[in-house]
Curated annotation (Swiss-Prot):
<feature type="transmembrane region" description="Helical">
    <location>
        <begin position="14"/>
        <end position="34"/>
    </location>
</feature>
<dbReference type="InterPro" id="IPR007816">
    <property type="entry name" value="ResB-like_domain"/>
</dbReference>
<comment type="similarity">
    <text>Belongs to the Ccs1/CcsB family.</text>
</comment>
<protein>
    <recommendedName>
        <fullName>Cytochrome c biogenesis protein CcsB</fullName>
    </recommendedName>
</protein>
<feature type="transmembrane region" description="Helical">
    <location>
        <begin position="72"/>
        <end position="92"/>
    </location>
</feature>
<dbReference type="GO" id="GO:0031676">
    <property type="term" value="C:plasma membrane-derived thylakoid membrane"/>
</dbReference>
<keyword id="KW-0472">Membrane</keyword>
<comment type="subunit">
    <text>May interact with CcsA.</text>
</comment>
<feature type="transmembrane region" description="Helical">
    <location>
        <begin position="162"/>
        <end position="182"/>
    </location>
</feature>
<keyword id="KW-0812">Transmembrane</keyword>
<keyword id="KW-1133">Transmembrane helix</keyword>
<keyword id="KW-0201">Cytochrome c-type biogenesis</keyword>
<keyword id="KW-0793">Thylakoid</keyword>
<dbReference type="Pfam" id="PF05140">
    <property type="entry name" value="ResB"/>
</dbReference>
<comment type="function">
    <text>Required during biogenesis of c-type cytochromes (cytochrome c6 and cytochrome f) at the step of heme attachment.</text>
</comment>
<dbReference type="InterPro" id="IPR023494">
    <property type="entry name" value="Cyt_c_bgen_Ccs1/CcsB/ResB"/>
</dbReference>
<dbReference type="GO" id="GO:0017004">
    <property type="term" value="P:cytochrome complex assembly"/>
</dbReference>
Length: 432
């Protein structure tokens, strides 16, 4: 039993909780520094030649579960430990402190008040007029007063004792919501070209929402850099005949029945070409990381046997489309909806470039719990700033004086400066 009490005391120690917060913050930083949720091979290949921090390679990242920090067993264990520490701290310290603060302490002797942090003695008539005046004045100032013959006890700001418990409760709810969202939520990143649809399935495998991208636009600055992306979406629920229209843009997500759709990225999906008098050909584009961060293109043969291919590359939907041969020599530069250019004897015209919208779809069931926990934490933090003040007064008819003492859990100096004004309100002449 003694060992269990020591263990509980160690777990609920404030220094342990602060240490856990530091470790959790450091772990969260790791999750920010290392890409999360990518394929296993991407870590093995990406960190084989250039280990993170010089020594953390892909195998170590996978073993330590750094590829999914926020759902790793050790990170969840840290959150559980911190939550247990907060619960034990509230149970062992904050709750007894609140119960003690709710109980009235009846000081009956002047010598008891002299041992308090703040103590004053003022002259007083032989009767209890000063105590009556003090009780009435404290009532007017919002104090709770318990008066007995020849003495009184008063307190104010007792609600501040609830603050730390609410902070602990809010943090626990916030962590529960975060864990619930990590384990029970869904996340999908998808590139959609205009006119393409995405069927979202429920747990039973049935479609519960059809999402169609009707239009996608990229707003650019005068230098050609993208500033804003806008996606026009149609959302159709099963059994409904009419789709609902919504727009999603950067920093303006769509929230729909627990699903949040973010405008996360953009890409180039396809290019429409006309070779000579051929029909319009819509060909898919792919990225070329070896040519740059945002370079798309395709390899186009110029002969029926596939020989003498040329590379068409571009960096935006507005072009230009650069044409290179196998030696890297630029053969032509084309613009969407622009004139035809002859490449190796073949007239080539770029009709249009089709951009794709990068959408991030998230379903996080823990978000309401996170918001509630955050709100409770804010309220608890505000209440914790309220000082709990306690005041006692004991009359001394024989010496015609009144002994006053007080306690305060924060800003004791402010309470000490306020006390003389409280006493001056009941008698114009006071002695210290």
């Amino acid at each position: 039993m003694v060992t269990l009490k020591r263990l509980l005391a160690w777990i609920s120690d404030l220094r342990i909780a602060i240490g856990l917060l530091f470790v959790i913050a450091l772990s969260s930083a790791l999750g920010t520094a290392i890409p999360q949720g990518e394929l296993r091979d991407s870590y093995l290949e990406g960190y084989s030649d250039k280990p993170w921090l010089g020594f953390v390679n892909g195998s170590m990242i996978l073993r330590l579960q750094l590829d999914h920090v926020y759902t790793s067993s050790w990170f969840l264990a840290l959150l559980a430990w911190l939550g247990l520490a907060l619960i034990l701290c509230s149970w062992r310290r904050q709750w007894p402190a609140l119960q003690a603060a709710l109980q009235w302490i009846d000081y009956q002797e002047p010598r008891q008040l002299s041992k308090l942090a703040i103590a004053e003695t003022i002259s007083s008539p032989p009767k209890n007029e000063s105590i009556d005046k003090l009780a009435a004045h404290l009532h007017q100032q919002g104090w709770q007063v318990q008066q007995q013959p020849g003495r009184l006890a008063a307190r104010r700001g007792i609600i501040g004792r609830v603050g730390p418990m609410l902070v602990h409760l809010g943090l626990v709810l916030l962590m529960l919501g975060a864990v619930w969202g990590s384990l029970g939520g869904n996340r999908l990143e998808q590139f959609l070209a205009p006119g393409r649809s995405l069927d979202l399935l429920n747990r039973d495998g049935n479609s519960h929402l059809k999402l169609t991208l009707t239009n996608f636009g990229i707003e650019r600055d005068p230098a050609g850099r993208p500033e804003q992306f806008r996606s026009q979406l149609e959302l159709l629920e099963p059994g409904q005949d009419t789709a609902k229209l919504h727009e999603v843009s950067v920093n303006h997500p769509l929230r729909f029945h627990g699903l949040t759709v973010y405008q996360a990225d953009w890409s180039l999906a396809a290019i429409t070409l006309q070779l000579g008098r051929s029909p319009l050909l819509q060909l898919p584009l792919r990225t070329f990381p070896e040519l740059g961060e945002q370079v798309w293109g395709l390899v186009l043969p110029t002969n029926p046997d596939g020989s003498e291919p040329v590379l068409l590359s571009l960096t935006s939907e507005a072009g230009p489309v650069q044409v290179f041969d196998a030696t890297g020599e630029r053969l032509a530069s084309l613009r969407p909806a622009g004139p035809t250019a002859e490449v190796k004897g073949i007239p080539i015209r770029v009709v249009e470039v089709l951009p794709a919208s990068g959408l991030l779809l998230k379903r996080d069931p823990g978000v309401p719990l996170v918001y509630i926990g955050f709100l409770i934490t804010l309220v608890g933090g505000g209440l914790s700033m309220i000082a709990t003040r306690q005041l006692w007064a004991v009359g001394d008819p024989e010496n015609e004086c009144l002994h006053v003492g007080g306690l305060c859990n924060r800003n004791l100096t402010g309470f000490a400066n306020e006390l003389p004004s409280l006493l001056a309100s009941i008698t114009p002449a006071s002695q210290h």
